[in-house]
């Protein structure tokens, strides 16, 4: 089976999509966003296509495309749709698969199912993306605890934003988690600038470590 990794985050709007674009590009893989909520502007799949440098056929179609930019459970209800977790099984592919979640781990997909419930069913390793700004310590440690409470493999934490060594170090130490690196905010966000920033900050060997053993 080809390597698979799930990219999740401590919150919405922290940079998971940009990180996913960098990761899938570095792995020369395929990208999948199971549930897209909000279609009026550039979707996350569109963003990854634009930034990853990969061809369009590497962007797998979403299982659900919902019109309203809201929590998936609410966006689905507005559209008159019920998200069926059984339809969110990981796709099989001969290339590395990068899966991007929506919002944070406990973001509801239905009135009774959260994203973390589906992630647990995938049995795939997770990368947790976190901000470096005020509040990230609590959010990060809570997310780490939630993953471990469900026996979800955590590859490590990827920080996004300006350097804040103390926050990054205390999260890694108290959470007993690998610090994978930090992706800075880029003044000019292009395929080339993102590729260079990711290569400078991360060791691709830290991802899919089991697959290369």
Curated annotation (Swiss-Prot):
GO terms for molecular function: ATP binding; dethiobiotin synthase activity; magnesium ion binding. InterPro entries: DTB_synth_BioD, P-loop_NTPase. The active site is at residue 33. It catalyses: (7R,8S)-7,8-diammoniononanoate + CO2 + ATP = (4R,5S)-dethiobiotin + ADP + phosphate + 3 H(+). Its EC number is 6.3.3.3. Pathway: Cofactor biosynthesis; biotin biosynthesis; biotin from 7,8-diaminononanoate: step 1/2. This is ATP-dependent dethiobiotin synthetase BioD. It comes from Rhodopseudomonas palustris (strain BisA53). The lineage of its organism: Bacteria, Pseudomonadati, Pseudomonadota, Alphaproteobacteria, Hyphomicrobiales.
